[in-house]
Amino acid sequence: MNAPVNKQMVVDAAAIQPLPNSRKIYVEGSRPDIQVPMREIRQADTPTQFGGEKNPPIFVYDTSGPYSDPAARIDIQSGLAPLRAAWIAQRGDCEQLPGLSSEYGRAREADPKLAELRFNLQRKPRRAKAGRNVTQMHYARRGIVTPEMEFVAIRENLNRRAYVESLQAAGNRRLLDLMTRQHQGQSFGAHLPEEITPEFVREEIAAGRAIIPANINHPESEPMIIGRNFLVKINGNIGNSAVTSSISEEVDKMTWGIRWGADTIMDLSTGKNIHETREWILRNSPVPIGTVPIYQALEKVNGKAEDLSWEIFRDTLIEQAEQGVDYFTIHAGVRLAYVPMTANRMTGIVSRGGSIMAKWCLAHHRENFLYTHFEDICEIMKAYDVAFSLGDGLRPGSAWDANDEAQLSELKTLGELTEIAWKHDVQVMIEGPGHVPMQLIKENMDKELEWCREAPFYTLGPLTTDIAPGYDHITSAIGAAQIGWYGTAMLCYVTQKEHLGLPNKHDVKEGIITYKLAAHAADLAKGHPGAQIRDNALSKARFEFRWEDQFNLGLDPDKARDFHDETLPKDSAKVAHFCSMCGPHFCSMKITQDVREYAASQGVGEQDALRLGMREKAIEFVKGGGKLYDKV
């Protein structure tokens, strides 16, 4: 854990390979330096016996940054290129500092024993000029459409217009109707325009219904948006602990997580060298990075919650903001008066941050200093454009505790704090539970929308049952899909190691894929424009026995291919009209194809073909003597 960073450290080769039959494309915005990444999945033509038509490429959201671009030069030691640096500088409202202003940051920088662990960043941190505000919300409320806003507008549309135009150009009206058909959704009041414009993005951010987490000290990040009127996003958690993991392992987890679709990453490190670990992650991350600053503050006082102070916490906020953290989980809603409400719970306070602040409140019998200093925190946030993720420190840790007085009291307070943050033009999202049975989930969403004025909701699951240790990625994905449908903007993944141990790379991938599935199911249920195109493409490939396209259009092509090849490994099986589930004689899709071919040969429709076929078999039965069984 304390070993020096390997100066030859490189990203895992598996994380930088393009996904099968995919390539990175960039859609240019109104200026040459707005290059929005997407993944293009190429498809095979439909076989001649099924119509012999061209299947144009499908475009999907891509969070992998330059790692999956063969043209990019990946060097973990140097970090990623500062994509947004020019945009930030051109606004003229921030300044480069002579050095770090955090006392702790300066101490780490000056410690020669840390030289082998340190990322050698050459540039100095930036901060807003005196009296200025550098948040995306501040710009939005002044009618300014930033490059970041245009970037996310293009990104959210997923090149859908180009896809539809390619279908129209082919002159195949049937294919156009087939691929763009989508069931009507139930959006529960969300506003889902057919096409996202930069102006729509600006309006949503100005109203507080969406955020773009984009610290001015994290110029490597590719802008993304979190809000219920946009695609549902997912977060992946990584981080070391006091007993396991290293810097290189955490960077590996980050690059692995974004390959499979993590829209943001939270570094929840609680072990040694938190500062250095975070620096390596930030400099190599194309997605926003979130943290829980109270974890590091606690390490600074040797794990004694009662020794925490506003001064230590403030220095930690500045330290992390100057490194480039894009959003902070702040447990300012854990008020002294709410702590006794948890006494009769089944599982008490399960949030680490919540329990830390509850212990501090009780030790001093004083109000939570995060609450009393909230406006001071806002001053720091707006100087760097760090977004609030207002923590649910009193979230239920069991179904028994769901939607209780403590949880809902804190949620009301988070709504009050949201309004204070908005007075400073600081971006806010609200964290949510937790462990909640399905019938109580909608109440959480409804109250959040009402009490928190439609600020984006960011939920951990929720886990819908407590009976499945080792399978909590599934128990939580059930609740995640449901609450995403109701309006949650971002889902925090849960891995199968939840409640059991620190996740490894395999667990990270399983958690990400599971939550991508939940988020997509929510987009479909809401009726998000274009959400069904990928489903339609995969279903068409499945019906036409285009096995490679089935694999490649899925969320995890590798697993799909491996499962297929366990029983049918030969290349010839990739063009077979069956799989090992039903075999060649009982494949429902093959039977349907046979019916269609018979109908075409008879010049009739499918229903008529079935009737004709039955009549022919009846005549054959009578001619054969009408015997129920033949002797063998």
Curated annotation (Swiss-Prot):
Residues engaged in binding Zn(2+): 435, 499
Pathway connected to this protein: Cofactor biosynthesis; thiamine diphosphate biosynthesis
Binding annotation for [4Fe-4S] cluster: 579, 582, 587
Record bears the keyword rRNA-binding: no
InterPro entries attached to this UniProt entry: ThiC (IPR037509), ThiC-associated_dom (IPR025747), ThiC/Bza_core_dom (IPR038521), ThiC/BzaA/B (IPR002817)
Pfam families attached to this UniProt entry: ThiC-associated, ThiC_Rad_SAM
One GO location term (cellular component): cytosol
Enzyme Commission number: 4.1.99.17
Tree of life domain: Bacteria
Keyword Iron included in the entry's annotation: yes
Uppermost EC category: lyase
Function statement: Catalyzes the synthesis of the hydroxymethylpyrimidine phosphate (HMP-P) moiety of thiamine from aminoimidazole ribotide (AIR) in a radical S-adenosyl-L-methionine (SAM)-dependent reaction.
Family under the similarity heading: Belongs to the ThiC family.
Quaternary organization: Homodimer.
Name recorded for this polypeptide: Phosphomethylpyrimidine synthase
Annotated organism of origin: Chromobacterium violaceum (strain ATCC 12472 / DSM 30191 / JCM 1249 / CCUG 213 / NBRC 12614 / NCIMB 9131 / NCTC 9757 / MK)
Gene name as annotated: thiC
